[in-house]
């Protein structure tokens, strides 16, 4: 014979310390849960990336040039130094209602046409099937105020015809390319690119609402510090539409800049257009008066001296008119205390003084000459003013036409080839990480709040005797059937381990229990042993049946009574029928002396549970059950009673009054210390002493590997 002993041990950590090894071990034990939850998250992310609406991005580049300085007062020589425009102000201007509102009007963005698809997944499915390009182009859509809250649906009949209806009862039939007018509703469909039967929802948004949407999707940033170059980015679902929108925004921004720069010239032209007819009218009146005076005085000629005075006066009036224009320009730049403004005023005063002197010389002339000089001066001054206005008008027209503004579109809008979002790789990776984190946290929390007994030492430290520690049988586990009921796993043995694999370590542990029971029951009042459990599905029936089998192998007559009249299945495990079982005996339908049924194991008999009664607890309290126990105790060397869990029903507390020894089964890493203590407390309240606890299904846990040590034994025959 050969014997092998393997010991795995590690130091015990303090209870107040964070045991990293235990945490890692707990995660390793629940690795399939972690992998499963992580896989579910990853699959959800993959499905999302397939069905999520792709968002595209278009960008354009705009340069804000320095002011070219096209002022009409450049000849003054004291203009301010040119500076680049403030980028922040220009960014706000691009995002203003002035610019975006014109884009909404130009592209009819206040009219939205969306295809009706299955919620959530419909649009994604259409993209996968290649039907995402079905559209209906609507350029005009208006409805009365009383229909503002109604939903309008456009149903495609073919590539030319359609019907328009609303949830308010409106219905009409239209044709592409023709204006539909009915009951105050006007609709212009330019083109239909959709299969017959397709439905679209036509919505009319407010201009302000669409401007807000444009502002949310538009991003304007400055490239560099005070570089004067702005980058415009617009995001959306339609590749072509976002490009057109961004081009329209850039173009409208440029146009408003030009309009702003030429606004001064435009206002001056409007003023001149108003003044020129009046000046021309006054000139005509002056010419008529001069001609009439000459005809009346027979064409009086002026002497050379008077003519020189007249020329000087006309010249001074022309200079005064020119100064008037210059003063209008310079007053926009400076105050009257500025040197340039003061120089102009001094020049005007000098001309006024000179004009006053000339008027004095005219006064000294004869009356006829005075009148002819005055009339001639009015005509010539009027002619000069009129010509100055005409010249100024031409200059302003040239200025207006030559205004290019400060904005230049460097790069027109173009849609980037890739998808901006969703980022499939990042989403899937993030889902995997999230699933991994949540599953690990869930496993650790479950382990923290539901920590089962992981060592016999835990029970012994609290004064609870451990009669046996039965290891988990991999052989039995492979043959067990498992059902999950309300989240709880129900294990059911299909073959007795003591018969199928008698050398299993679990059977060796049960044989050790058999030896311990021999001494434990020496002082008992009878030879009846009750086996109960803390909770369901902990292997109580497994321990009880195999214990009965190994005891019967010592040439002792053993009777196993299945008192679990609700869920007992020992008759299936031992291969007997369930006829005339315990429930029939207790209600008087069966004979006690013939109730025991032999099993395939010698000296091992069984009383099955019988048919499920409506009142198992009441039957166990009957005198009939006491008679059965007394008869069994007299006719067998050992009587084992398999009872339901004490925390589930009270059957064990009733049966315990008839037995001499009671043992309780707890499952390793499943039942908690609190559950064991509560179970013992219930037996104590009913006056039933419990000899000890059997810790069942012990296995080497990754989380407990380093705590109390783990032993593996092999003891087999030598190979020959």
From Swiss-Prot:
Give its localization.
Answer: Cell inner membrane
Effect in UniProt of substituting residue 569 to F: Loss of autophosphorylation
Q: What's noted about post-translational modification? A: Autophosphorylated. Seems to be phosphorylated through a cooperative two-step mechanism. First, Tyr-569 is phosphorylated in an intramolecular reaction that generates a significant increase of protein kinase activity. Then Tyr-708, Tyr-710, Tyr-711, Tyr-713 and Tyr-715 are phosphorylated in an intermolecular Tyr-569-dependent reaction.
Catalytic activity of the protein: L-tyrosyl-[protein] + ATP = O-phospho-L-tyrosyl-[protein] + ADP + H(+)
User: How is the enzymatic or functional activity of this protein modulated?
Assistant: Dephosphorylated and activated by wzb.
Q: Which InterPro entries match?
A: AAA_dom, Bact_polysacc_biosynth/exp, GNVR, LPS_length_determ_N_term, P-loop_NTPase, Wzc-like_C
Q: Name one GO molecular function term.
A: protein tyrosine kinase activity
* Mode of membrane association: Multi-pass membrane protein
UniProt entry tagged with the keyword Disulfide bond: no
UniProt cross-references to SUPFAM superfamilies, sorted A to Z: P-loop containing nucleoside triphosphate hydrolases (SSF52540)
- Periplasmic compartment ranges equal 53-424
Transmembrane regions listed in the UniProt entry: 32-52, 425-445
Which Pfam families does its entry note? AAA_31, GNVR, WZC_N, Wzz
Q: Which residues lie on this side of the membrane: Cytoplasmic?
A: 1-31, 446-720
Report the EC number(s), separated by commas if there are several.
Answer: 2.7.10.-
Function recorded in the entry: Required for the extracellular polysaccharide colanic acid synthesis. The autophosphorylated form is inactive. Probably involved in the export of colanic acid from the cell to medium. Phosphorylates udg.
Q: What is this protein called?
A: Tyrosine-protein kinase wzc
Q: To which species is this protein native?
A: Escherichia coli (strain K12)
Gene transcribed to yield this protein: wzc
């Amino acid at each position: 014979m050969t014997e092998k002993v393997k010991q795995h041990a590690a130091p015990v950590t303090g209870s107040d310390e964070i045991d990293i090894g235990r945490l890692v071990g707990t995660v390793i034990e629940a690795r399939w849960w972690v992998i499963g939850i992580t896989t579910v998250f990853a699959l959800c992310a993959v499905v999302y990336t397939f069905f999520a609406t792709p968002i595209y991005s278009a960008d354009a580049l705009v340069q804000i040039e320095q002011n070219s300085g096209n002022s009409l007062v450049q000849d003054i020589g004291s203009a301010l130094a040119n500076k680049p425009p403030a980028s922040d102000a220009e960014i706000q201007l691009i995002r203003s209602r002035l610019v975006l509102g014109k884009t909404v009007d130009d592209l009819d963005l206040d009219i939205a046409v969306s295809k009706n698809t299955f919620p959530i997944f419909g649009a994604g499915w259409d993209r996968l099937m290649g039907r995402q390009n079905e559209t209906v182009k609507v350029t005009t859509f208006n409805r009365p105020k009383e229909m503002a809250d109604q939903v309008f649906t456009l149903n495609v009949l073919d590539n030319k015809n359609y019907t328009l209806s609303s949830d308010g009862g409106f219905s009409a039939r239209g044709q592409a390319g023709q204006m539909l007018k009915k009951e105050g509703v006007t609709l212009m469909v330019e083109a239909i690119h959709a299969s017959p039967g397709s439905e679209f929802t036509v919505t009319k948004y407010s201009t302000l609402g669409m401007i807000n949407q444009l502002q949310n999707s538009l991003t304007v940033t400055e490239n560099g510090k005070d570089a004067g170059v702005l980058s415009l980015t617009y995001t959306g679902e339609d590749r072509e539409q976002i490009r057109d929108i961004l081009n329209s925004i850039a173009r409208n921004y440029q146009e408003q800049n030009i309009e702003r720069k030429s606004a001064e010239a435009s206002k001056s032209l409007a003023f001149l257009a108003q003044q020129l007819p009046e000046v021309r009218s006054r000139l005509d009146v002056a010419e008529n008066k001069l001609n009439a005076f000459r005809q009346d005085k027979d064409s009086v000629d002026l002497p050379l001296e008077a003519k020189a005075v007249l020329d000087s006066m006309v010249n001074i009036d022309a200079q005064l008119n020119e100064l008037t224009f210059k003063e209008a320009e310079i007053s926009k730049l400076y105050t009257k205390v500025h040197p340039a403004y003061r120089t102009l005023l001094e020049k005007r005063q000098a001309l006024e003084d000179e004009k006053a002197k000339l008027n004095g010389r005219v006064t000294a002339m004869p009356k006829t000459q005075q009148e002819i000089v005055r009339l001639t001066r009015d005509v010539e001054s009027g002619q000069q003013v009129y010509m100055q206005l005409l010249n100024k008008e031409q200059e302003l027209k040239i200025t207006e036409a030559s205004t290019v503004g400060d904005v230049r579109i460097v790069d027109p809008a173009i849609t980037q080839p890739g998808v901006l979002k969703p980022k499939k790789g990042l989403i899937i990776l993030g889902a995997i990480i999230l699933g991994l984190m949540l599953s690990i946290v869930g496993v650790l929390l479950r382990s923290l709040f539901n920590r089962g007994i992981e060592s016999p030492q835990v029970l012994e430290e609290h004064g609870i005797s451990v009669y046996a520690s039965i290891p988990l049988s991999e052989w039995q586990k492979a043959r067990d059937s498992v059902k999950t009921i309300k989240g709880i796993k129900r294990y059911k043995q299909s073959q007795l381990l003591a018969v199928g694999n008698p050398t299993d370590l679990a059977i060796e542990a049960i044989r050790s229990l058999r030896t311990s029971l021999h001494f434990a029951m020496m002082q008992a009042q009878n030879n009846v042993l009750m086996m109960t459990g803390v909770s369901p599905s902990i292997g109580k029936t497994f321990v009880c049946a195999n214990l009965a089998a190994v005891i019967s192998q010592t040439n002792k007559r053993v009777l196993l009574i299945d008192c679990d009249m609700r869920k007992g299945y020992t008759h299936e495990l031992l291969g007997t029928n369930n006829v005339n079982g315990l429930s029939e005996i207790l209600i008087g339908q069966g004979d006690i002396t013939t109730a025991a049924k032999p099993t395939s194991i010698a000296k091992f008999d069984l009383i099955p549970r019988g048919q499920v009664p409506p009142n198992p607890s009441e039957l166990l309290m009957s005198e009939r059950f006491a008679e059965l126990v007394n008869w069994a105790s007299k006719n067998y060397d050992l009587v084992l009673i398999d009872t339901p869990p004490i925390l589930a029903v009270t059957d064990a507390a009733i049966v315990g009054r008839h037995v001499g020894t009671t043992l309780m089964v707890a499952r390793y890493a499943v039942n908690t210390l609190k559950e064991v203590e509560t179970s013992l407390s219930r037996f104590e309240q009913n006056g039933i002493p419990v000899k000890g606890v059997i810790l069942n299904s012990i296995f080497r846990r990754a989380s407990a590997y380093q705590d109390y040590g783990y032993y593996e034994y092999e003891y087999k025959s030598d190979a020959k």
